[in-house]
């Protein structure tokens, strides 16, 4: 996971803003 900007936090709320491989950030 990658700590991205606001887009990641909105997409992965459960992961505390952590971007997963399947998440589009």
Swiss-Prot record:
It is found in: Secreted, Cell wall. Keywords: Antibiotic, Antimicrobial, Cell wall, Fungicide, Plant defense, Secreted. The keyword Secreted applies. The keyword Thylakoid does not apply. One of its GO terms (biological process) is defense response to fungus. Distributed in the epidermal cell layer of leaves and in the subepidermal layer region of stems. Not in roots. One of its GO terms (cellular component) is extracellular region. Belongs to the DEFL family. Group IV subfamily. Antimicrobial peptide. Active against Fusarium spp., Gram-positive and Gram-negative bacterial pathogens. This is Defensin D3. It comes from Spinacia oleracea (Spinach). The lineage of its organism: Eukaryota, Viridiplantae, Streptophyta, Embryophyta, Tracheophyta.
